[in-house]
C-alpha cells in the first residue's frame, strides 16, 4: 500500500541530446514518516516531487498510490497531495487566513478554526492573520505555505525547499513540527540543509 515507484525513468531533451535524470528508480515509501531528499542541484530531487504530484506525466514506469496508478485516481492531486512550493504559490491580495481557507476550499476540505489557530500560533503568525500576503516577508510567506499544506490533512505532503527563506530558529522549529506531523502522514522534503537528517531515519541522497 502507500506510495510506490516502479522502474521509473525520467529523461529530458536538451540541445546536446537526451539527458537521463534517473533510470529504473524503485522506491516503496512508508505509509507515514518524514523523508529527507538531498543532493546536488540538477540531480532530480524537485523533478521527483513533480512526478509524484502528478504535475509531470512524461516518464516511463509506474507511480502507484495504494496499488493504483496515480493517473487513474480521480482527483489525485486534490485528495492525496499537498505541495509546498519554493515560490510559495500564495495569492498576494488575500490575507493569511483567506489564503489558507481558499486553498482548503479548492480541495473540498472544511477548515477547523481551532486547528488553524493552533498552527498560526506554532508558526508565530497569529498577529498577522488578517494581513495581506503581499505585505509579508519571504520567511513569513513560507510559513503561510506550510500552514496551508498542513491544514488540508492530505496523506502526502511534498515540500520543495520549504525552509529556504527561514532563519535557523524557525527552520529547526519547522523540522520538529514536521517530525510530529509525519506520525499520521507521509512528508517528503527536498532540502539542501543536511541538518534535516537528524529529524528523520529516512534519507534519500541524489547524486548526479
Tell where the protein language model's regions lie, with residue ranges.
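A short, flexible loop at the N-terminus of ABC-type nucleotide-binding domains that lies
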Residues: 1-5, 10-24
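Conserved ABC transporter NBD signature motif
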Residues: 61-71
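ABC ATPase NBD coupling module
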Residues: 69-82, 181
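Helix-to-loop junction immediately C-terminal to a conserved catalytic motif
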Residues: 53
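Conserved ABC ATPase "signature" region
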Residues: 113-128
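Conserved ABC ATPase signature
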Residues: 132-136, 140
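Catalytic Walker B motif of ABC-type/P-loop ATPase nucleotide-binding domains
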Residues: 157-160
